[in-house]
Each structure stands twice: as structure tokens, then as C-alpha cells.
Amino acid sequence: MQELEERIQSEGTVKAGNVLKVDAFLNHQCDVRLFDRMGSAWAAHFAGKHITKILTIEASGIGIACVAAQHFGNVPVVFAKKAQSINLDGDQYTTTVYSFTKQKEFPVIVAKKYLNAGDHVLLIDDFLANGKALRGLIDLCEAAGATVEGIGIAVEKGFQGGGDALRAEGYDVDSLAIVESMNPETGEITFRH
């Protein structure tokens, strides 16, 4: 998506440790108009799929997923929680994922009443690096017997291999911007097309 690539080039910052900071428009301050166009792009890509639910992970995927849901007939959005809470009651699906950004493992939890065997799920997230967070969401869907129809990603770090691995497993991954390389010393960002 050219508009997203341009925003990354003009407003993104490359940090040491393969970190791309895009908090001006994606994951701290949210550009809702951009999110709307992202949702439209995913709706076009996944037009042949029967999406009944969108699943993301807290926190940065929530805004993108909610806006995107409007392009899929306002299907429900479920977000996996990263910690047990008194608000989470009843039976749950739980798995553990490793966060590249936070450099630690954490549980991800979804109440069983919100993820079902009849669901056809679109996974959405802001970033895809090594694919661990998405693997956790896939595990939750498998535990529920739900079908993963596709994966929508705002920014994929192509050089970290997570997207390529998921595609090799047969998942339909639609990343709107794929960063091929980035240099923290020069700030240069190269995209895969």
C-alpha cells in the first residue's frame, strides 16, 4: 500500500535492534482515515472469504481491527488479552507467545464464548516480525476449531521471516507494507514489492 509506505518513510524512525517506530500514525497516535483505507485494502484482498470474526491481540491491533471490521459487514472483533483479569471469567483458550517488541513471553487468552468452531477468522495486527504473536492467535483458533481465513498485517518486517514462514504453511498473509531492510544509522528503509 503506497500510502502506508510513504507514511513509514516520512514519519517512521528506525531504532537499533530492528525496531521501527511508527507511533505518530499507527500504534500510539492513530490515523483513523489511514486505518479505514487499510481496512478497505484488506476487504478487497479477502473479498472471496466468508469472514465472521476478526481476531487481534491487545493493544496496538485493536484500533486497526475495529476500523477494518466495518469493511467486513461490521463483524465482531475479539482481542486476545495478554494477562489474566478479573473480567475474564468462564472457560478460556490460552497459549503463550514471545513478544519481539517487549522481549518477553506472555500468555494470550480468549474467552471460549467469543471464539467458536463455526467462526471464519481474519487475524489482524499492526506488525509481523518473527510471527510469534500470530502463531499464538492461530493456536487459539485451532483450539476453538475456528478456521483462519487470512491474516491482515499493516507492517511486515520481511527480513525477520515470520511472514514468509506463514505463507509457506499456506496462510493467506496480506501485508500492506513489507519492510525488506532498514538501517538505524542512516534511517534508510527499503520495501519489498
Curated annotation (Swiss-Prot):
SUPFAM superfamilies in UniProt? PRTase-like
Cellular localization per UniProt: Cytoplasm
Q: Which GO terms describe its molecular function?
A: xanthine phosphoribosyltransferase activity
Domain of life, source organism: Bacteria
| Presence of the UniProt keyword Cytoplasm in the record | yes
Gene3D superfamilies referenced in this protein's UniProt entry, alphabetically? 3.40.50.2020
Any one GO CC term of the record: cytoplasm
- Could you list this entry's UniProt keywords, alphabetically sorted: Cytoplasm, Glycosyltransferase, Purine salvage, Transferase
Q: In which pathway does it act?
A: Purine metabolism; XMP biosynthesis via salvage pathway; XMP from xanthine: step 1/1
Q: Where, by residue number, does 5-phospho-alpha-D-ribose 1-diphosphate bind?
A: A129, N130, G131, K132, A133
- Gene Ontology biological-process entries: purine ribonucleoside salvage; xanthine metabolic process; XMP salvage
User: What NCBIfam families does the annotation carry?
Assistant: PRK09219.1 (NF006671), XPRTase (TIGR01744)
Quaternary structure, from the entry: Homodimer.
| Name of the protein this chain belongs to | Xanthine phosphoribosyltransferase
Gene (UniProt): xpt
